[in-house]
Amino acid sequence: MAPEINTKLTVPVHSATGGEKRAYVTFLAGTGDYVKGVVGLAKGLRKAKSKYPLVVAVLPDVPEDHRKQLVDQGCVVKEIEPVYPPENQTEFAMAYYVINYSKLRIWEFVEYNKMIYLDGDIQVFDNIDHLFDLPNGQFYAVMDCFCEKTWSHSPQYKIGYCQQCPDKVTWPEAKLGPKPPLYFNAGMFVYEPNLSTYHNLLETVKIVPPTLFAEQDFLNMYFKDIYKPIPPVYNLVLAMLWRHPENIELDQVKVVHYCAAGAKPWRFTGEEENMDREDIKMLVKKWWDIYNDESLDYKNVVIGDSHKKQQTLQQFIEALSEAGALQYVKAPSAA
């Protein structure tokens, strides 16, 4: 039978209180053009009227001008050190996957009670702040699809089995053993930063042999006992549009993951397989509409000299503080 996933997620209706701090977080490495994706994500969250900031975990090789672009878009930029798996002969499904182990550093961000991780090639088209209200103690993410060629190494792909339609092909337990546990796409997940978890993740990654999908496989292994699936509207992997269209209502999708080959909007040519589809071109256009919308650029509050303006500014700061959106950075001493 198919796993039970409510198509409409029900969460408690309440706001963060009692000093609870929440934030979105993404990851950026290198000098390439992925910074465009993160800028687009920051603007998308702003258009969706999210109450919470976007933290960008950057590796030391991210250049200063890219960091400035992110700060100018209201992001909280936090430098992290790389995390590498044990040396091995594994060929990752994509060569750049190896650097993604550095995402494990985000469990160290304990100044926040709860965070939602989003890859830099994701866009948020509707408010998802309610996901912060999901019960604590679980790891929430959207199930992945096994039907693309990048999964050709797996027994699932070889027998035509996919957890998105588990009744279509019966898992042959007699031949392959127990059915694999549910497997999530690690481009989006809801989690709780925790130093104990953080240190254990780093210790565990030292002894677990790397696999083709790098940190995604690792996180699936590590959190398999507390993983709770959430509906695909919170992380639409584009392959779902041609592999499992019966599972997708495109007008209900809140988060789109441009992870298919050729799908990155800032590199899009439409020449790769499936990229000439009208729904794909529409989603790429929607991304560009947000990226190019100057009204969505972050705007600093200008301090005026009147008492009234100062009162308004103070109210604005208090509102941001309550929402967990204000970051205080100590200035260096002039002494």
Swiss-Prot record:
What's the top EC group for this one?
transferase
Quote the tissue specificity entry. Answer: Accumulates in mature seeds.
InterPro entries from the UniProt entry: Glyco_trans_8, GNT1/Glycosyltrans_8, Nucleotide-diphossugar_trans
Q: Is Zinc there in the keyword field?
A: no
GO MF, one annotated term: inositol 3-alpha-galactosyltransferase activity
Look up the record and name the cofactor or cofactors this protein needs: a divalent metal cation
Q: Which residues form the active site?
A: 103
UniProt subcellular location: Cytoplasm
Primary site of residence: cytoplasm
* Keywords from the UniProt entry: Carbohydrate metabolism, Cytoplasm, Galactose metabolism, Glycosyltransferase, Manganese, Metal-binding, Transferase
Record-listed E.C. numbers = 2.4.1.123
Q: Which family is it part of?
A: Belongs to the glycosyltransferase 8 family. Galactosyltransferase subfamily.
Q: Known PANTHER family for this protein?
A: GLYCOGENIN SUBFAMILY MEMBER
> What does the UniProt function comment say about this protein?
Galactinol synthase involved in the biosynthesis of raffinose family oligosaccharides (RFOs) that function as osmoprotectants. Promotes stress tolerance of factors such as drought, chilling, salinity and methylviologen (MV), a superoxide radical generating drug, by mediating an increase in levels of the endogenous osmoprotective compounds, galactinol and raffinose.
Q: What is this protein called?
A: Galactinol synthase 2
What species is given as this protein's source? Arabidopsis thaliana
